[in-house]
Design a protein with these regions (language model features):
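Helix N-cap and loop-to-helix transition residues
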Residues: 12, 31, 100-104
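Short, structured helix-loop boundary elements
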Residues: 10-14, 18, 48, 79, ...
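General structural signal for alpha-helix termini and helix-helix connectors
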Residues: 3-7, 37, 44, 68-72, ...
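C-terminal peripheral helix-coil segments that are non-catalytic and often amphipathic
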Residues: 26, 60-68, 82-136
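Short, solvent-exposed loop/turn segments at secondary-structure boundaries
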Residues: 49-51, 101
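Hydrophobic alpha-helical bundle segments that form small-molecule/ligand-binding pockets
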Residues: 10, 26-37, 41, 48, ...
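Hydrophobic alpha-helical connector segments
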Residues: 2-29
């Protein structure tokens, strides 16, 4: 999530969304134990709570990344839009793991579509890009 993103290559927020989701998929695909822990449905309350907290933290990071590159509109205070978008996409990935023991390319695409569809309820199609100052 914190790896550099080439700001000049971004045209719309959906470009950034795709980069972020592809990075998350790479993590899930590279580590079977993490994939099972994060995506498998399990009955352990402690694990579910830890997973939810992890999603909230990632949601905050994702908001910061999007806000760095685009001029975001006002978002609701009572719903963590980015965390919820990620959780919804994760449900699609989890379904793929349940059915196929992996995230198939088709279900990866569907998960990204769900992520974008939910964010699209809050982010207009065209967002102004920020002018990034060089990092020192």
């Amino acid at each position: 999530m914190q790896a550099p993103i080439d700001h000049e290559q971004l045209t719309t927020w959906r470009d950034l969304s795709r980069i972020v989701e592809l990075r998350m998929l790479a993590i899930y695909n590279a580590d079977a134990a993490a994939r099972q822990l994060i995506l498998a449905q399990h009955g352990l309350t402690e694990i579910n709570q830890a997973d939810r907290q992890h999603d909230i933290e990632l949601g905050h990071l994702m908001l910061e990344v999007f806000d760095r590159h685009f001029q975001l509109p006002a978002l609701p205070d009572d719903v963590d839009v980015f965390a919820l978008a990620m959780e919804l996409g994760d449900r699609v990935y989890a379904r793929s793991v349940q059915l196929h023991d992996e995230i198939t390319p088709r279900m990866a695409e569907e998960g990204m579509r769900v992520f974008d569809a939910y964010l699209g309820l809050y982010l207009p199609v065209f967002l102004g890009k920020r002018t990034l100052l060089p990092l020192r």
